[in-house]
């Protein structure tokens, strides 16, 4: 028995159709614009809770926040974040 058809359109038919390109000429650029707005407005930083590029180092804390001893990590993290 040979392989049967799944009833789906072949991919070559899809990407050569005018309908495909009309839809995707709008949706693909819209996704890029939406992503750019998501990051440039700062909404991505607010949603994911990451610091903005100018918030990594404050005037009071200029050192890199590294944890050096894994057994006292909790105390080191509390010391690093007490000014936040």
From Swiss-Prot:
Cellular localisation: Plastid, Chloroplast thylakoid membrane
SUPFAM superfamilies the record matches: Cytochrome b559 subunits
PROSITE patterns linked: CYTOCHROME_B559
TM stretches of this protein: 22-36
Keyword annotations from UniProtKB, A to Z: Chloroplast, Electron transport, Heme, Iron, Membrane, Metal-binding, Photosynthesis, Photosystem II, Plastid, Thylakoid, Transmembrane, Transmembrane helix, Transport
GO terms under biological process: photosynthetic electron transport chain
One GO CC term, this protein: chloroplast thylakoid membrane
Major localisation: plastid
Cofactor(s) of this protein: heme b
Record InterPro entries: PSII_cyt_b559_asu, PSII_cyt_b559_asu_sf, PSII_cyt_b559_CS, PSII_cyt_b559_N, PSII_cytb559_asu_lum
Membrane topology: Single-pass membrane protein
Cofactor note: With its partner (PsbF) binds heme. PSII binds additional chlorophylls, carotenoids and specific lipids.
Subunit note: Heterodimer of an alpha subunit and a beta subunit. PSII is composed of 1 copy each of membrane proteins PsbA, PsbB, PsbC, PsbD, PsbE, PsbF, PsbH, PsbI, PsbJ, PsbK, PsbL, PsbM, PsbT, PsbX, PsbY, PsbZ, Psb30/Ycf12, at least 3 peripheral proteins of the oxygen-evolving complex and a large number of cofactors. It forms dimeric complexes.
Sequence similarity: Belongs to the PsbE/PsbF family.
Name listed for the protein in its UniProt record: Cytochrome b559 subunit alpha
Name of the gene: psbE
């Amino acid at each position: 028995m040979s392989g049967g058809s799944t009833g789906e359109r072949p991919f070559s038919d899809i990407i050569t159709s005018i309908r495909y390109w009309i839809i995707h000429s709008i949706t693909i650029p819209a996704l890029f614009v939406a992503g750019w707005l998501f990051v440039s407005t700062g909404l991505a930083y607010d949603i994911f809770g990451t610091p903005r590029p100018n918030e990594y180092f404050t005037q009071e804390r200029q050192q890199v926040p590294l944890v050096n001893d894994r057994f006292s990590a909790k105390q080191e993290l509390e010391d690093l974040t007490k000014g936040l």
